């Protein structure tokens, strides 16, 4: 999230914190003031929330322009110095050919890259180096978009303005907010609405736009091409968010209604006592199913929200498995001897589904039925890191589930 106006530091602090559901590894803020120049702070947020790590930094930061981000991979923002000047870069997406692009730049002797503890190249730094190959930000961004295999949305902060670019296929959103004394941009619209802004523009696929304290100017027109990630509505997006004008919570509820309609039409409506949803994103799907089917909705398990994050966020598979099991606390009175249908938002690795079925039977459920709000994820996504497949992180197509009898 970025901002240009007189109270921007605190607004970016709170607005970036509203993106905490999108990442749990690194947070960063960069501001600029004529007196102090660029000021940057980056912290690990794996064991502490964004607000806790940055509240002292905010008191010290000064400037008339500021940008912040939360990342599940790279430390960001990255500072880049080139013929285009000194600027900060944030990015989101997956660069499949990062190593190849880095080698090409190094062979030209035109770049040094910041590496992460894993040894991988920081994607924001790579993008900044690609942009620096051209004589303007627009040409540089277009060049980077053409060279990158995968998905790249980015934000650049100079000492005068911010430039934002949505990926060519429009897989991820970038939204601009307006208030009487300034403008901002964000991934999530609700992040700035709580700060008094209202949405004034949503970037099209491939669009490049400059934002100043006086307004925004489209530097390069986008297209109506839409390949936005459906997982934003299914799972990843926050319930209050809207993408392409469609609210996440309403979509999930309607999806549950459609599942119930299909079951009723095909004679598959189960004889159960309750419909329940896997917290958090499975709950509205379950509410929609219950409303349409007439089966009562109940919460036989409660997510312990103070400490347990979403189960796909931890970096190791063993920790994901443990989180999936530990975060749900049973309400025995709503489980023992009951026939239950639970609704989950998706089946990616099968970990949570298996744990939930075992959890319900272990706590005395008589029958357990389940519905998934979207088809099983059969392959890892090469464009975004929502459901990527690695050697220890395999989609459900390769997983055999043994359920209790």
Question: What does each model-identified segment do?
Answer:
Residues 2-8, 399-405:
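Conserved small/polar residues in nucleotide/adenosyl-binding loops
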Residues 3-204, 210-273, 278, 367:
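Conserved short alpha-helical segments that host acidic/polar catalytic motifs at enzyme active sites
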Residues 97, 171-172, 192-193, 217-218, ...:
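Flexible loop/turn segments at secondary-structure boundaries
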Residues 117-125, 297-309, 401:
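A conserved beta-strand->alpha-helix junction
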Residues 160-161, 196-202, 357-401:
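PRPP-dependent phosphoribosyltransferase catalytic core
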Residues 265-271, 291-298, 332-336, 358-367:
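Secondary-structure transition/capping motifs at alpha-helix termini
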Residues 275, 282-289, 297, 339-360:
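Extended, hydrophobic alpha-helical segments in both membrane/secreted and soluble proteins
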Residues 294-340, 378-390:
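Short, glycine/charge-rich flexible loops or terminal/linker lids adjacent to PRPP-binding catalytic cores
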């Amino acid at each position: 999230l970025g901002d240009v106006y007189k109270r921007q530091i605190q607004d970016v602090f709170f607005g970036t914190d509203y993106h905490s559901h999108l990442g749990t590894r690194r947070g960063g803020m960069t501001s600029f003031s004529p007196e102090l120049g660029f000021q940057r702070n980056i912290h690990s947020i794996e064991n502490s929330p964004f607000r806790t790590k940055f509240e002292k930094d905010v008191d010290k930061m000064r400037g008339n322009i500021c940008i912040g981000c939360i990342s599940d991979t790279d430390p960001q923002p990255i500072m880049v110095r080139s013929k285009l000047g000194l600027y900060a870069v944030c990015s989101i997406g997956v660069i499949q050919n990062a190593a190849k692009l880095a080698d090409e730049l190094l062979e030209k002797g035109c770049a040094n890259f910041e590496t992460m503890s894993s040894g991988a190249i920081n994607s924001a730094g790579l993008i900044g180096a690609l942009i620096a190959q051209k004589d303007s930000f627009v040409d540089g961004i277009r060049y980077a978009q053409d060279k990158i295999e995968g998905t790249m949305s980015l934000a650049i902060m100079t000492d005068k303005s911010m430039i934002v670019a949505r990926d060519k296929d429009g897989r991820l959103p970038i939204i601009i907010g307006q208030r009487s004394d300034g403008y901002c941009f964000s991934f999530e619209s609700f992040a700035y609405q709580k700060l008094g802004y209202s949405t004034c523009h949503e970037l099209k696929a491939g669009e490049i736009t400059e934002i100043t304290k006086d307004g925004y100017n489209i530097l390069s027109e986008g297209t109506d091409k839409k390949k936005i990630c459906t997982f934003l509505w299914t799972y990843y997006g926050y319930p209050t968010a809207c993408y392409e004008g469609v609210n996440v919570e309403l979509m999930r509820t309607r999806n549950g209604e459609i599942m119930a309609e299909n079951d009723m039409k095909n004679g598959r409506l189960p004889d159960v006592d309750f419909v329940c949803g896997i917290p958090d994103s499975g709950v509205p799907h379950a509410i929609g199913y219950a409303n349409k089917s007439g089966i009562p909705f109940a919460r036989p398990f409660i997510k312990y929200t103070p400490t347990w994050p979403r189960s796909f966020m931890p970096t190791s598979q063993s920790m994901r498995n443990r989180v999936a099991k530990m975060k749900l606390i049973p309400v025995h009175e709503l489980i023992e001897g009951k026939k239950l249908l639970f609704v989950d938002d998706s089946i990616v690795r099968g970990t949570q589904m298996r744990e939930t079925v075992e959890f319900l039977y272990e706590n005395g459920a008589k029958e357990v039925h389940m519905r998934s709000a979207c088809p099983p994820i059969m392959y890892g996504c090469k464009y975004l890191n929502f459901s990527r497949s690695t050697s220890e992180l395999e989609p459900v197509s390769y997983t055999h589930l043994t359920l209790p009898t």
